[in-house]
UniProtKB/Swiss-Prot annotation:
NCBIfam families: PRK15440.1. The active site is at residue 329. The record marks 302 as: Increases basicity of active site His. It catalyses: L-rhamnonate = 2-dehydro-3-deoxy-L-rhamnonate + H2O. Its EC number is 4.2.1.90. Its cofactor is Mg(2+). This is L-rhamnonate dehydratase. The gene is rhmD. Substrate binds at residues 33, 59, 349. The keyword Lyase applies.
């Protein structure tokens, strides 16, 4: 008989945070909303809070950046480590160190699905439909995949079965699709700036923005709108039709996550050929099944928020069974290793984190070292050919470990 590789057990899990309300502001990293002043990501973007004038101008004014970055590191008995980052900050550290640790330590590094199910089952009574708890579980799951890849010496995408294409092509999310086109991206997705409280004037302003970018970018470059849960069905439907003359490719996350009937109605009434998309703030596999049943065109889970890579693979299968695309909310290497193995992900998202969208800054900068960025709008699979997720933790980021066990 051939010898089978003996895998080590997990010795310890540790959790740090940086940024957020209890640390330095503008830290970036896993909480990419935690940016400094004069950044497009915080400039009068429509949100569910925009109807309150005190919180209309800035998303940071209502606390979008209070959580900060969570870093989870798992160490095997042989000394090898894996890690991941997400948005959960100091509270995520508590959950990892005081609750989830019992399901991780002592397990084999390959026991990812067992650990995942135990974490989900043990937090049902306080996790609700996602949010902070699911962000934390996602971060642990990603760290486990990173460790497993490093122990066996393979990139995560090969652990998932290998690439189905040679490269990933990207669209860019940011305020300047015209600059994204110059950088080689296939499309540009802009945030909306107005909402139902602004009435028809808001629709005219956002439609004018799309018209202006269509003129700058030409006929064939993709243009999309990200509405960040800020609308109702009637407003979203009117906005979609107002943008139809400018060949808007899709309208994204118009409604809050649980308004499934609203998404069904929006898809039914949207202009022919315009796609309806959503999913980044859905936090359970069950919610994605229900979202899929509404008939939307693209589901957009965030691998750092939906339950991790283990859940993302399951979501992709649900979408594939219905002929839907799954295009994850931008998550850098954590998405790259997944989508290059999905047959129903023909393109992916790159989130522009440079303040004016004029330069290529890694999404989770500065917390990850060696984080790849698209070149001419693409990343070749060979760039991902490093053990685990292929990135290292920047330990100069003033990481704090508030709890231990």
């Amino acid at each position: 008989m051939e010898n089978i590789m003996t895998l080590p057990k997990i010795k310890q899990v540790r959790a740090w945070f940086t940024g957020g309300a209890t640390a330095e502001k503008g830290a970036g990293g896993g909480d990419y909303h935690d940016q400094g002043a004069n950044h497009w990501i915080d400039d009068h973007i429509a949100t569910p809070m925009s109807k309150y004038r005190d919180y209309e101008q800035s998303r940071q004014s209502f606390g979008i950046n209070v959580l900060g970055t969570l870093v989870v590191e798992v160490e095997a008995e042989n000394g090898q480590t894996g890690f991941a980052v997400s948005t959960a900050g100091e509270m995520g550290c508590f959950i990892v160190e005081k609750h989830l640790n019992r399901f991780i330590e002592g397990k084999c590094v390959s026991d990812i699905k067992l650990i995942h199910d135990q974490m989900l089952s043990a937090t049902l009574y306080y996790s609700g439909s996602g949010g902070l708890v699911m962000n934390t579980i996602s971060c642990v799951d990603l760290a486990l995949w990173d460790l497993f890849g490093k122990v066996v010496g393979l990139p995560v995408y090969k652990l998932l079965g290998g690439a189905v294409r040679d490269e990933i092509q990207f669209y860019a999310t940011g305020a300047r699709p015209d600059l994204a086109k110059e950088m080689g991206f296939i499309g540009g997705k802009m945030p909306t700036h107005w909402g139902p409280h602004d009435g028809d004037a808001g629709i005219r302003k956002d439609a004018a923005m799309v018209a202006d970018m269509r003129e700058k970018c030409g006929e064939d470059f993709w243009l999309m709108l990200d509405c960040w849960m800020s609308q109702d069905v009637n407003y979203a439907t009117k906005l979609a039709h107002a943008c139809a003359p400018y060949n808007l490719k899709w309208i994204e996350e118009c409604l809050p996550p649980q308004q499934y009937e609203g998404y069904r109605e929006l898809k039914r009434n949207a202009p022919v050929g315009m796609m309806v998309t959503s999913g980044e703030h859905h936090g359970t596999l069950q919610s994605f099944r229900t979202l899929s049943e509404t008939g939307i065109d693209i589901m957009q889970p965030d691998v750092g928020w939906c339950g991790g890579l283990t859940t993302l693979v399951e979501i992709a299968a649900i979408a594939k069974s219905r002929g839907q695309l799954v295009v994850p909310h931008g998550s850098s290497v954590y998405s790259h290793h997944a989508v290059i193995t999905f047959t129903n992900t023909p393109f992916s998202e790159f989130l522009m984190t440079s303040p004016d969208c004029s330069t290529m800054r890694p999404q989770f900068d500065p917390i990850l070292l060696n984080e790849p960025v698209p070149v001419n709008g693409r990343i070749h699979k060979s760039v991902l050919d490093k053990p685990g997720f292929g990135v290292e933790l920047n330990r100069d980021c003033n990481l704090k470990r508030p709890y231990s066990h």
